[in-house]
Regions:
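Conserved hydrolase catalytic core segment
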Residues: 1-33
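Short aromatic-enriched loop/helix-cap "lid" or pocket-rim segments at secondary-structure transitions
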Residues: 29-34, 145, 170-172
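Short, well-ordered alpha-helices that flank and scaffold nucleotide-derived cofactor binding pockets
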Residues: 4-9, 147-150, 181
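Catalytic active-site module of serine/aspartate enzymes centered on a nucleophile-bearing elbow/loop
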Residues: 154-188
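Non-transmembrane alpha-helical segments in soluble domains
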Residues: 67-71, 149, 176, 180-183
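Alpha/beta-hydrolase
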Residues: 33, 38-124, 128
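Short, solvent-exposed loop/turn segments at secondary-structure junctions
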Residues: 12, 25-26, 137-139, 164-165
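Conserved loop-alpha-helix segment in the C-terminal half of the alpha/beta-hydrolase fold
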Residues: 113, 120-163
Length: 188
């Protein structure tokens, strides 16, 4: 999101290329796509999430369990194997207050300060070559990624088959190779 806003609003000189990895140009489109993903969940999980959204109570254990399943399906594993990189296995400090303020209680209910982030119509203003990366099961759904690809004139889209929001973890060798080749081609 930040790179989109920066390139569109400030039109900085000296930027040779941009990389948008599982980002989005529109909070409303993002929310719409998360709600589409929700329809693929069990009826029980859908009901728990719908109840939380309707009441504003995001503390119910049924909701929390449903949201965990949603995030595991579309973001990342809730636990990693012992041999995973340390940055994935160490205990995380959650920035719940900042996340709630900026975005909202979850990925599909944007109520924070970014809820009105809408840049689809301004994507053609991005002139820098832009690499867009996403996974097939990503929070950044193929529709969200394709919207950026269609809107940014000089863009390339790499879709990671079977990957979620953290494609850089799920297929790290391909991800690193892709970024290295992109930067060699555009930023040297």
């Amino acid at each position: 999101m930040l790179i989109i806003e920066y390139l569109v609003n400030y039109k900085p000189e000296g930027i040779k290329s941009a990389i948008i990895s599982s980002g989005h140009p529109s909070s409303s489109l993002w929310s719409q796509e998360q709600h589409r993903w929700l329809k693929l969940m069990s009826a029980e999980d859908q009901a728990a999430i719908a109840k939380a959204e309707a009441t504003g109570d995001f503390s119910d254990p049924a909701y929390l369990a449903a949201n965990d399943r949603f995030m595991e399906r579309h973001c990342c594993p809730l636990t990693y194997p012992a041999d995973a990189p340390e940055c994935l296995t160490r205990e995380k400090k959650h920035g719940d207050e900042a996340y709630l303020y900026g975005w909202g209680p979850n990925e599909y209910t944007p109520t924070g300060t970014l809820k009105d982030f809408e840049y689809i119509d301004r994507l053609p203003e991005i002139k820098e070559p832009t690499l867009i990366i996403s996974g097939t099961y990503d929070l950044c759904s193929p529709l969200v990624a394709k919207t950026m690809y269609d809107g940014i004139p000089n863009s390339r889209w790499e879709l990671f088959e079977g990957a979620r929001h953290m494609c850089f973890v799920e297929d790290n060798p391909r991800y690193v190779k892709l970024l290295s080749e992109w930067m060699r081609e555009h930023d040297d």
